[in-house]
Amino acid sequence: DSTWDATSPRYFNDGKYKVQNYGNHNYGHISLARATELSSNTAYVDLGEKIGISKVVDMGAKLGIDSTLNPNPSLVLGTAGVTPMEMAEVYATLANGGVHNDPYGISEIVGRTGKQLYKVQLNSKQVVDKKVASAVTEVLEGVVENGTAKGYGCKYQPVAGKTGTTSDVK
């Protein structure tokens, strides 16, 4: 279990890139799970730099992001223009134990006589280890239980999520 520097503000890219947490909150050194719960920008930019932004781009593609992702430090903060469908693919892949399926609108068509006229052909692919997908999902459940989405859970079913902020009105 490692800890990440979630102090705010922090400077990256030889001092050229200033990153702050929302409200400039200073969280100190915390686990990655807690950084996710608190939506710590500084910890995630640090993580992205340490693992390499190109690996983040590659993983995004495996999880279902087809949009062009520019490999810069702010990418880990959600600055790329991805579609809601792509984000749904990412979260569906994690919830599906790391197995990716291309999205589809119609799973089956049955005629009046009951004959199956069409059935979707899934192209399932394990893109993330099942244990890793489970661990990530557990961390995202923590966002709803203990973090920035606290109070938005469901009493009768597990809920996972991730919050974020924007400076743009979209």
Q: How should each PLM-predicted stretch be described?
A:
Residues 16-21, 52-89, 105:
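Mid-domain, small-residue-enriched loop/turn segments at the edges of structured enzyme/sensor domains
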Residues 6-10, 59-63, 108-109:
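Short acidic/histidine-centered micro-motifs embedded in hydrophobic/aromatic stretches
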Residues 34, 38, 83-88, 93-170:
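A penicillin-recognizing enzyme superfamily signal
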Residues 46-47, 77, 161-163:
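Thr-Gly-centered strand-to-loop micro-motif
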Residues 2, 7, 73-75, 104-107:
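Extracytoplasmic/periplasmic beta-strand context in beta-sandwich domains
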Residues 2-56, 100, 114-142:
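Conserved catalytic neighborhood of penicillin-recognizing serine enzymes
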Residues 1, 66-68, 96-101:
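Secondary-structure transition/capping motifs at alpha-helix termini
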